[in-house]
């Protein structure tokens, strides 16, 4: 079966963000997200109005990739960046925890993430969602690039080959 690590990350995150926006009512951006920057190291707020959904999808993928409990501090470090301080040397800052924490809480309400003593882990529903999205992306990529058909599961591969007329 196709996993979320076997497809391009940008395609997975974009598709997952669109799915979250349309189908998961528990995940909604707070009103302050229109004005907030994603860190003190940024000069302006994000230009994409759907950045909340993209960040939620990205967090889901990071939890999937880790395969172990991940804490808020680790996610803050992952989303952190370097701040230009004028004449002073650049310095690395962590991302603010409020947005990440609220997204994790919303993902918990949607039952895509579970909270454990060591941190947050992906729930079976969350893992299934990411794997399903990865499978759909691989099917789309296979239509564009037929050489990727070898990565499809055997039954789907046969169906694809019979439909396309390739033997």
Regions found by a protein language model. Give the residues of each.
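Basic, low-complexity intrinsically disordered segments
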Residues: 98
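Short, amphipathic alpha-helical interaction segments positioned at domain boundaries
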Residues: 124-167
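A short, conserved structural fragment
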Residues: 104-118
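Short, hydrophobic-biased segments on the C-terminal half of alpha helices
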Residues: 72, 101-105
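Short acidic, hydrophobic short linear motifs in intrinsically disordered regions
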Residues: 69-91
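Short conserved catalytic/interaction loops centered on acidic-Pro-aromatic/His motifs
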Residues: 86-90, 114-120
């Amino acid at each position: 079966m196709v996993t979320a690590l076997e497809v391009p990350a940008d395609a997975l995150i974009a598709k997952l963000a669109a799915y979250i926006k349309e189908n998961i009512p528990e995940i909604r951006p707070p009103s302050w997200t229109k004005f907030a920057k994603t860190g003190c190291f940024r000069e302006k707020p994000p230009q994409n109005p759907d950045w909340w959904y993209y960040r939620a999808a990205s967090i889901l993928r990071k939890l999937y990739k880790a395969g172990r409990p991940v804490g808020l501090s680790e996610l803050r470090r992952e989303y952190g960046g370097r701040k230009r301080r004028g004449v002073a040397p650049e310095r690395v800052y962590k991302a603010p925890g409020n947005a990440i924490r609220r997204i994790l809480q919303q993902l918990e309400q949607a039952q895509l993430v579970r909270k454990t003593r060591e941190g947050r882990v992906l729930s079976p529903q969350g893992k299934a969602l990411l794997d399903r999205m990865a499978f759909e992306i691989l099917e789309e990529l296979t239509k564009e690039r037929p050489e990727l058909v070898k990565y499809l599961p055997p039954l789907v591969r046969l169906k694809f080959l019979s439909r396309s007329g390739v033997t």
